[in-house]
Amino acid sequence: MKKQISVLVVALMAAAMISGCGKKEEASAPAAAPAPAAAIVVGLDDNFPPMGFRDEKNALVGFDIDLATEAGKRLGAEVTFKPIDWNAKEAELNGKRVDVLWNGLTITEERKANILFTTPYLENRQIIVVLDNSAIKNKAELAGKVLGVQDGSSAVEAVQKDEAIAKSLKELKKFPDNVTALMDLSAGRLDALVVDEVVGRYYTAKKSGEYRVLEENFGTEDYGVGTRKDDTELMGKIDK
């Protein structure tokens, strides 16, 4: 988990339906078997492509799914995935219904109060997506508009930090997931959507000609894997 991964690499891989954790390094001598680890339950939002989502066969797939699965193999632990209400992710984690949060989880100072994070593994931006034929060209032109965000996501905080823009909006509309928000954008019920770049680039590549990404954005952030604050042993293993 030490090296950050390019957000554009993730988006391009997903758009091309290619995913993976990378090639293992060959060892000159057989490595010692890892100490057995307990099963790890991963909490995720299963409507968050390309990091975690369901394919046409309803199987969970995605970049973070592959990373967590590979981590489990290296730890000798069985990994199971549990879709959760992302707005209640901290309650799910600290209520011990899941062991880790691993699905495009942004590291923030507020979340650090309740979550122990790994070293960042991916740099992300909060981008602005509009319809391709929209007259909106920049952030200032969001004034008087309905702007969508996923409830409980870092997009909410990113928009609220920009007080001038936040106060100028007609409405900051919150959705349970980005897929629903994009449907409202396509239907004209939203003027724009603030979303993680990995998600935005995935959909703009998938639906070329329907969406457009503005040059301005709402800032850069880092993704990390989250465990309970007292679960330092598991954190240390994942963070190797």
Regions found by a protein language model. Give the residues of each.
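Ligand-binding cleft/hinge of the Venus flytrap
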Residues: 52-54, 68-77, 155-175, 204-208
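A conserved helix-loop-strand patch within extracytoplasmic ligand-binding domains
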Residues: 77, 85-88, 105-109, 113, ...
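Alpha-to-beta junction loops
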Residues: 76-78, 94-103, 145-146, 177, ...
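Bacterial lipoprotein signal-peptidase II cleavage site
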Residues: 18-30
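Extracytoplasmic small-molecule ligand-binding "clamshell" domains
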Residues: 34-104, 174
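Extended ligand-binding regions for polar small-molecule ligands
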Residues: 24, 65-74, 133-136, 140-141, ...
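A ligand-binding cleft/hinge motif common to bilobed small-molecule-binding domains
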Residues: 88, 105-113, 158-163, 184-219
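Periplasmic-binding protein-like
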Residues: 46, 122-130, 197-239
